[in-house]
């Protein structure tokens, strides 16, 4: 589904199901340079077993428009805002890679909304290729394209 958040079209995968606020909710958060496709199988599985499943594409990722957020804190605040706009009050949050850091940050900002956290392949430090760091300084969009290319 698409919704307008912060004046941008924001895509949130729901597994093709309508959101029913009385159902339990799981939200999956992708890592840097990724999108909701990281969770295709999980989204389908839980959506077809009575859960609301949400997996938003962060700004500038996947089908969402806008400039990518510049920090983990911005990602967490953005995610909270999107879920609040949809009407989700409590949820389980699953993060992959950088999404784990977003989930951890969200747990510090607003712990009362979480029923649980799932960390998938997270790390406290992620080594980054020196060439990519240089490209990010010169041309952030080229660096993003390289991450997507190298990731597939």
Show which residues each predicted segment covers.
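Alpha/beta-hydrolase active-site loop signature
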Residues: 33, 58-62, 124
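Conserved hydrolase catalytic core segment
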Residues: 89-127
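Helix-rich cap/lid subdomain of alpha/beta-hydrolase
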Residues: 118-152
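Active-site loop/oxyanion-hole signature of alpha/beta-hydrolase fold enzymes
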Residues: 3-13, 40-48, 52-94
């Amino acid at each position: 589904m698409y919704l307008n958040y912060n004046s941008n079209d924001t895509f949130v995968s729901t597994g093709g199901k309508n959101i029913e606020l009385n159902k339990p909710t799981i939200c999956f958060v992708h890592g840097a340079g990724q999108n909701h496709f990281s969770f295709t199988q999980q989204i389908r599985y839980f959506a077809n077993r009575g859960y609301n499943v949400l997996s938003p594409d962060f700004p500038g990722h996947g089908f969402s428009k806008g400039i990518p957020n510049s920090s983990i804190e911005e990602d967490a605040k953005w995610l909270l805002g999107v879920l609040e706009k949809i009407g989700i009050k409590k949820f389980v949050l699953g993060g992959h890679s950088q999404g784990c850091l977003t989930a951890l940050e969200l747990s510090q900002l607003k712990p009362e909304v979480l029923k649980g956290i799932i960390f998938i392949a997270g790390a406290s430090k992620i080594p980054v290729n020196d060439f990519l760091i240089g490209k990010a300084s010169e041309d952030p969009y080229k660096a993003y394209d390289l991450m997507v290319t190298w990731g597939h």
